Swiss-Prot record:
Gene (UniProt): Atxn10
PANTHER family, alphabetized: ATAXIN-10
GO MF terms held by the record: enzyme binding; identical protein binding
Cellular compartments annotated: Cytoplasm; Cytoplasm, Perinuclear region; Midbody; Cytoplasm, Cytoskeleton, Cilium basal body
Residue numbers of Phosphoserine PTMs: S12, S77, S430
Top-level division of the source organism's lineage: Eukaryota
Family the entry assigns: Belongs to the ataxin-10 family.
Full protein name: Ataxin-10
Biological source species: Rattus norvegicus (Rat)
Omega-N-methylarginine modification, residue list: R10
One Gene Ontology cellular component: centriole
Swiss-Prot/TrEMBL GO biological process terms: cell division; cilium assembly; nervous system development; neuron projection development; regulation of cytokinesis
Length: 475
């Protein structure tokens, strides 16, 4: 392809406003590089010329950083810088030859340095913002599917560029910076993040602030969640709201359309240890909500979300076995269920059964389903596990579960989860079956309630038999 001629922008060694020819030539190149055939035939000399213009224009930005009064004179330089970045950005699209040529000219280092200068300026100018965005887009494109370029971008950009841009007020800059981070990360570079946890935390914050942006979400699902070491190190540093965000993404990964792979399972077993330990240690935080009903206690919300994660993990047969034998987990779940059941019956609070729906955002809405999820988790942990079935009985959990079956708008599907738990508690467990049958005979379990749940007690000689009505499907 024939490149438009670009005359020099210096006369007699004195900096002058950018010649209109330079800008027009760059714009022409940018348009040409939208076509694949033009990208594939571009001579290396073009990229050297673009780099020369970029370097010369950078001098004006450096001057403005040293002398803020010069900012008002940046317009022509910013126009050239923006068009240089657009030109280079387009040249890199699905063209490894151009990516390599541009990288080998050390354009990446110049671009990163310039982007960092933009952050230093801290002035509100649309032209500066546009140049900033285009610079990040170029860095993302030059690194896309090119490991050599990714390495160079990482060397120049980590950690300063990510620290500077992930918390930028402009959501497009955050998105483009996240794209660069996503593109450049690999298993080795994850270790760098472990030593710079603030960057990882900034990604969580970016997802919180901009949930519509796919890049922060993809960084967390495709990189962070594949590193149990990073997740564990980061979890202790996160705010409670950030923990809720991370746990929500973990749930999304577990229940997503794509089934967890064998590698995912081994990683999530490590996550399960963190989640279970955190729940066992912190589950009583949820009780703060009984004394401070008007306060959205963030620690309590973390506990609620930890329970949600455990419910989804124990619904996965490959994760279930590990959690069924996790020390202290069943005991804690029964303990919390007993306390909130007692508190809910003794006084009016957010754990009391309700027959009226709550508005979204109310603290009652935040705790919706907590009690029924405790029972769901008990049912999961008892699935084909006699040791846990017996443990629930020993902890007096069976009467507690049966007494929790009242309709409660705060706990949708409560009856279904009670039925599910009772079935798993009694499957191939004659001792638990006898226990419930005797409760019914002694009036401690309502026969009509048991029938509604799909169970009935029959007398055979001097023995009581608990029978299940298989016509009622599990939840």
């Amino acid at each position: 392809m024939a490149a438009p001629r670009m005359p020099p922008s210096r006369l007699s060694g004195i900096m002058v406003p950018a010649p209109i020819q330079d800008l027009e030539a760059l714009r022409a190149l940018t348009a040409l590089f939208k076509e694949q055939r033009n990208r594939e035939t571009a001579p290396r000399t073009i990229f050297q010329r673009v780099l020369d213009i970029l370097k010369k224009s950078t001098q004006a930005v450096e001057l403005a950083c040293r002398d803020p009064s010069q900012v008002e004179h940046l317009a022509s330089s910013l126009q050239l810088i923006t068009e240089c970045f657009r030109c280079l950005r387009n040249a890199c699209i699905e063209c490894s030859v151009n990516q390599n040529s541009i990288r080998n000219l050390d354009t990446i280092g110049v671009a990163v340095d310039l982007v960092l200068l933009f952050r230093e300026l801290r002035v509100e100018q649309d032209s500066l913002l546009t140049a900033f965005r285009c610079g990040l887009q170029f860095l993302g494109n030059v690194a896309s599917r090119n490991e050599d370029s990714q390495s160079i971008v990482w060397v120049h950009a980590f950690p300063e560029l990510f620290m500077s841009c992930l918390n930028h007020p402009d959501k497009k800059i955050v998105a483009y910076c996240s794209m660069i981070l996503f593109t450049s990360l690999n298993s080795e570079r994850m270790k760098d993040l472990e030593e710079n946890l603030n960057i990882a935390i900034n990604v969580i914050e970016a997802h919180q602030k901009h949930p519509e942006s796919e890049w922060p979400f993809l960084i967390i699902t495709d990189h962070f969640l594949k590193s149990p070491e990073l997740v564990e190190a980061m979890y202790g540093k996160l705010s409670n709201q950030e923990r809720v965000t991370l746990l929500d993404i973990m749930i999304a990964k577990i229940v997503g359309d794509e089934q967890l792979t064998k590698d995912d399972i081994s990683i999530f077993l490590r996550h399960a240890e963190l989640i279970a330990n955190s729940f066992v240690d912190q589950c009583r935080n949820v009780l703060k909500l009984t004394s401070e009903p008007q306060t959205e206690d963030k620690e309590a919300l973390v506990t609620i979300r930890l329970l949600d994660v455990l419910c989804e993990m124990t619904s996965n047969t490959e994760l279930l076995g590990y959690l069924q034998v996790f020390p202290g987990l069943m005991e804690r779940v029964i303990d919390v269920l007993r306390v909130i059941h007692s508190v809910g019956k003794d006084s009016t609070n957010i754990f009391s059964p309700s027959d009226s729906l709550k508005a979204e955002g109310d603290i009652e809405h935040m705790t919706e389903g907590f009690k029924s999820h405790l029972i769901r988790l008990i049912g999961n942990l008892c699935y084909k596990n006699k040791e846990n079935q017996d443990k629930v009985n020993e902890l007096d959990g069976i009467p507690l579960i049966l007494d929790s079956s009242n309709i409660d708008d705060n706990n949708p599907f409560m009856m279904q989860w009670v039925v599910y738990a009772v079935r798993n508690l009694t499957e191939d467990n004659s001792q638990n079956q006898d226990f419930i049958a005797k409760m019914e005979e002694q009036g401690l379990a309502d026969a009509s309630l048991l029938k509604k749940m799909g169970f009935e007690v029959e007398k055979s000689g001097d023995k009581l038999i608990l029978k299940s009505n298989n016509d009622i499907p599990p939840p």
